């Protein structure tokens, strides 16, 4: 029997490319969690049956056990020594189960994951999921190394299989554990400490990250240079001569002086002389070197500065171009091509695009030059176009990025730009002036990269010893100016220089400081720190500057590199780094008042923030509504904070009082045409009076997700109070046909009356011709749903003889059922004799038990967010 070879790629599109190349297009495909492509072929000299499938990035993520996920019940200090576990990144995708099923009965496993450290780490995740022992590496388990998804590269990789690198996989494990524990410990402490104290502190999570925070530190450092800058006046001489009827300005060798009187003295000396003597003429042949190969960091910098595309977006576009086979692997630190690289084939693939066809054909006909010797990081060749694309196929931004990659590659194999530089030196009154002219003799690579062209300017011809009359000598007055805010491109350069992040993670860190509201991206993609970002960095600086300096992260990256090279034990590195951060965390906690003083100076206390909105059920005084994230109410008298649902609007709801606690109800409205609106009691929402409600409703809350703060859980549509007219008991109509929830009458949806599910996004549109719709205390004898009363408009009533009032069950009453419409769900069938009732939130019971038991215990705060 022929052996079975399971091959696993990182993305479905790459799996398809691999299968197509190895099978010659003769394969069958069947559906699974990801597609499985099957074909017959040869493996290690024997006939074999191949199965090619894929994961979708990382299969497993590192996290804390459930016992450590409660923000209130866990001391952040304990996280440094807490165990970590690996759970499936996306349980709904069922990748783990898929790999285990496909691996059954397989003889060999070939790993086609991306060829970087993350890819090596995913290799071992895949091995764990398949159940094949790690001891089989080299016998049954192999690794394919490739830099593009072209047929040639795939065939070469298949013919030269290697082994996955355990050391590189362990290096990623070490970084993940360090970033998780350090980031979550600091984040939980400072978020809990500062949230709820200040009303205009606009942030749900005040996060810390070993990479994220030094990245922010660079932005704040530039901001501080700008705010502390003091302009200073300066003066310079502008000397002019007339040649062939043209006025020519000469540059003063002293550039500028900061003493006006001295500048005036030099002006008088030159003016009194009246003649400029040509003392030297220099003519040199200069060369502007072609660029080396393109690596990830340089691509991101150009995308931001020249194309206006942010690093995160640029990386996503580059990855898409790679998976579609248009470019080589986009995550590389190398700028040097291997000696065996086939430049002629790469150029020939681009010859038919009219934008650069002339340049390419010239290079192919007259000969191209090899790129400059760059840096060889030993990972992947520089980013290179692999096949021709069109703007229509890629879309605007992807095309612009692809176009630059093509132009850069063509530039690397083009000749250098050559030009003649002429410099003429003049003297007068003991002062020296000069003028410089450039004349391009060979455009070289700048013909394909015109933005790098040498500026040409012709200067008049003079001979040494010529005496030239001075036309005028002016004094120019100016002031020094502060530096501009850091651009994304400049920030990326600083991160690379200081060892912050990797070519793969740099875009994530830059994006995170924007997402966390620490900086804002202004015109020119310049990063302006917010008050929160500035105050955080100033706080770290006054407690422990190491927390926001790049030195620690640089040290960590160096240690992780040693692990990847097999020169350091990953457990010892993790233990050593965490011990250092434990000491810093302990000191930070003791000195947090220093940071708090800065927050107090920048932000307003809750008592001074917000507007009066609703009455407190405890003291009967009006509470203040704080609209900044996270939205909340604050009772000045009781000094209590009540968190509210986020990402919507809040207003008082008809001055209705909750019968359980005396608080005034609020109406929360989500955003969007089909979004829900629902009433809630602030106290019940934060402290659900019925057991299990907070778990039933997947609202955000501090002790589970760290997104909102304390508590959150029970709007009125989940309340089980038997007589309250806003509760699920009185407003619930029937079980949701899509999930285990209950359809609730939307109290403010008139005139477009509707029901919405209290668990999923299912919406049922009720008769629009109704003047009023309300629930009754009657039950349908057939299905036990609540009978509703509909008051139709007189002009549009469907009832006989102009009647307007009608009672019925929306499931069993033929008239009402014909007038309702289902949205965001499956078809809504009439029920006959099922007798399941409304379910009181349980809907169809055990038939959807698995969906109903979904948990919301994702704290995540994992390393990817820091």
Swiss-Prot record:
Skewed-composition ranges (Basic and acidic residues): 854-866
List of catalytic residues: 329 (o-(5'-phospho-dna)-tyrosine intermediate)
Record's signal peptide: none
EC number: 5.6.2.1
Protein name: DNA topoisomerase 3-beta
Region (Interaction with DNA): 207-212
Residues reported in the UniProt entry to bind Mg(2+) 1: 10, 114
UniProt cofactor(s): Mg(2+)
Entry GO terms, CC: nucleus
């Amino acid at each position: 029997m022929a052996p079975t070879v399971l091959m696993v790629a990182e993305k479905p599109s790459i799996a398809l490319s691999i299968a197509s190349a190895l099978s010659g297009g003769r394969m069958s495909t069947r559906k699974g969690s990801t597609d499985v492509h099957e074909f017959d072929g040869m493996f290690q000299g024997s006939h074999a049956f191949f199965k090619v499938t894929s994961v979708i990035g990382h299969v497993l993520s590192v996290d804390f056990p459930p016992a450590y996920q409660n923000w209130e019940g866990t001391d952040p200090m304990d996280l440094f020594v807490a165990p970590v576990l690996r759970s499936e990144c996306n349980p709904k995708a069922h990748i783990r189960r898929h790999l285990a099923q496909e691996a059954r009965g397989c003889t060999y496993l070939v790993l086609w994951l991306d060829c970087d450290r993350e890819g090596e780490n995913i290799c071992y995740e895949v091995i764990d999921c398949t159940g094949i022992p790690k001891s089989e590496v080299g016998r049954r388990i192999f690794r394919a190394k490739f830099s593009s998804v072209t047929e040639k590269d795939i065939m070469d990789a298949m013919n030269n299989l290697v082994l996955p690198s355990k050391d590189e996989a362990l290096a990623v494990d070490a970084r993940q554990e360090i970033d998780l524990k350090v980031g979550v410990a600091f984040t939980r402490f400072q978020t809990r400490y500062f949230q709820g104290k200040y009303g205009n502190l606009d942030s749900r999570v005040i996060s810390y990250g070993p990479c994220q925070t030094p990245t922010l530190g660079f932005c704040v450092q530039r901001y501080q240079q700008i705010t502390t800058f003091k302009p200073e006046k300066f003066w310079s001489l502008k000397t002019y001569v007339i040649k062939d009827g043209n006025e020519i300005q000469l540059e003063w060798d002293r550039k500028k002086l900061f003493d006006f009187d001295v500048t005036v003295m030099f002006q008088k000396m030159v003016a009194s002389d009246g003649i400029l003597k040509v003392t030297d003429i220099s003519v040199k042949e200069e060369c502007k070197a072609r660029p080396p190969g393109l690596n990830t960091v340089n691509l991101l910098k150009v995308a931001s500065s020249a194309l206006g595309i942010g690093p995160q977006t640029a990386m996503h576009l580059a990855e898409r171009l790679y998976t579609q086979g248009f470019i080589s692997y986009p995550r590389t630190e190398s700028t040097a091509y291997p000696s065996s690289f086939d430049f002629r084939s790469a150029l020939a693939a681009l010859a038919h695009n009219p934008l650069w066809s002339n340049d390419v054909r010239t290079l192919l006909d007259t000969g191209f030059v090899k790129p400059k010797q760059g840096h060889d990081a030993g990972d992947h060749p520089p980013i290179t176009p692999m096949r021709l694309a069109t703007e229509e196929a890629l879309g605007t931004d992807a095309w612009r990025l692809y176009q630059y990659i093509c132009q850069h590659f063509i530039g690397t194999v083009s000749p250098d730009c050559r030009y003649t530089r002429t410099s003429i030196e003049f003297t007068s009154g003991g002062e020296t002036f000069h003028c410089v002219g450039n004349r391009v003799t060979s455009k070289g690579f700048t013909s394909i990269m015109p933005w790098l062209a040498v500026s040409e300017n012709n200067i008049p011809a003079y001979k040494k010893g010529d005496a030239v009359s001075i036309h005028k000598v002016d004094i120019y007055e100016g002031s020094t100016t502060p530096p501009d805010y850091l651009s994304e491109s400049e920030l990326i350069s600083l991160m690379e220089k200081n060892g912050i992040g990797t070519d793969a993670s740099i875009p994530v860190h830059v994006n995170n400081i924007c997402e966390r509201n620490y900086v804002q991206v202004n015109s020119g993609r310049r990063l302006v720190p917010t008050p929160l970002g500035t105050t955080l960095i100033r706080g770290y600086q006054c407690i422990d500057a190491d927390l926001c300096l790049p030195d620690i992260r640089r040290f960590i990256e160096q240690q992780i590199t040693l692990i990847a090279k097999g020169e350091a034990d990953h457990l010892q590195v993790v233990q050593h780094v965490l011990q250092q951060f434990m000491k810093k965390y302990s000191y930070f906690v003791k000195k947090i008042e220093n940071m708090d003083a800065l927050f107090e100076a920048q932000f307003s206390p809750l008592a001074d923030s917000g507007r009066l909105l609703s009455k407190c059920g405890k003291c009967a005084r009006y509470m203040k509504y704080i609209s900044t994230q996270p939205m909340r109410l604050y009772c000045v008298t009781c000094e209590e904070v009540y968190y509210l649902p986020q990402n919507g609007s809040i207003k008082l709801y008809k001055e209705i009082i909750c019968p359980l606690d005396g608080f005034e109800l609020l109406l929360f409205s989500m955003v969007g045409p089909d979004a829900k609106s629902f009433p809630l009691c602030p106290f019940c929402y934060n402290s659900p009076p019925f057991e299990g409600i907070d778990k039933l409703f997947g609202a955000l809350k501090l002790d589970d997700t760290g997104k909102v703060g304390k508590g959150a859980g029970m709007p009125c549509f989940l309340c089980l109070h038997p007589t309250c007219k806003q509760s699920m008991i009185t407003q619930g109509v029937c079980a949701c046909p899509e999930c285990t929830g209950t359809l609730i009458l939307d109290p403010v949806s008139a005139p477009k009356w509707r029901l919405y599910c209290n668990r999923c996004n299912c919406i049922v549109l009720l008769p629009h011709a109704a003047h009023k719709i309300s629930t009754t205390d009657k039950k349908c004898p057939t299905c036990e749903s609540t009978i509703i009363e509909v008051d139709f408009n007189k002009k549009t009533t469907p009832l006989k003889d102009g009647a307007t009032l009608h009672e019925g069950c929306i499931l069993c009453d033929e008239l009402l059922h014909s007038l309702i419409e289902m949205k965001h769900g499956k078809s809504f069938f009439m029920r006959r004799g099922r007798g399941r009732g409304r379910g009181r939130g349980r809907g169809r019971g055990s038939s959807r038990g698995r969906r109903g038991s979904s948990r919301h215990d994702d704290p995540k705060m994992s390393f990817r967010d820091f």
